[in-house]
């Protein structure tokens, strides 16, 4: 659990989060099951409720510690900017009455002026001036500049073909494979195909074995409308007394 002395300043800093949040009235159908669920999760004799409470405590502890550590880091960075002292990477948490509760330090050693590539004196420069700028050779000696004295690698001249040659080309060019690629297997004379294709409206069967009975053709009797349609029409287009003259450019 979080001590009361540590929780107090954090809750004071996070006062806006502790204010009552306006809740939406979801009605009786939704609010009653939610209240029952929270009541079941607050029980002590249920394994699921115990796991839920343990998780809530863990989340609360993480939230308080995260807020406290962020405030401490901001305060420490502001203090270093004002005073001008650079203690390398020191983070202190001063929320409790006893002072700092925990401390994490990271020391970066700057490179010495006489450090060489991979030399023993440049590997761990313990004593360095305070005003020296840290360099990468302090963390990884030997990688501060490109390696010297190493001959450049020769270019690997690999024969790369200009085109692609299919491995089946020699078989395709053979005289037996110069056809169009279709199967020319001769089918026997008495071969019957039993694969039936669905043909609508009683189409012809592919594998029919017995002849269909012949149906005599009976012409459909003509109806009265058909007889009227076949009657000759004596309607003529009305023509005037003057014969049609072709149009000319003079008109």
From Swiss-Prot:
Annotated region (Binding to FLNC), positions in chain: 67-110
The keyword Metal-binding is annotated on this UniProt entry: no
Compartment(s) of residence: Cytoplasm, Myofibril, Sarcomere, Z line
Cellular component annotations (GO), alphabetically ordered: actin cytoskeleton; Z disc
Stretches for region Binding to ACTN2, PPP3CA and TCAP: 50-67
Modification type Phosphoserine: residues: 31
Tissue distribution of the protein: Expressed specifically in skeletal muscle. Not detected in heart.
Region called Disordered, residue ranges: 79-102
One GO molecular-function entry: FATZ binding
Stored InterPro entries: MYOZ
Positions of the UniProt region annotated as Binding to ACTN2: 186-207
Domain of life: Eukaryota
Keywords: Cytoplasm, Phosphoprotein
Job description of the protein: Myozenins may serve as intracellular binding proteins involved in linking Z line proteins such as alpha-actinin, gamma-filamin, TCAP/telethonin, LDB3/ZASP and localizing calcineurin signaling to the sarcomere. Plays an important role in the modulation of calcineurin signaling. May play a role in myofibrillogenesis.
Family: Belongs to the myozenin family.
Subunit structure and binding partners: Interacts with ACTN2, LDB3, FLNC, PPP3CA and TCAP.
Name of the protein in question: Myozenin-3
Annotated source species: Homo sapiens (Human)
Organismal lineage: Eukaryota, Metazoa, Chordata, Craniata, Vertebrata
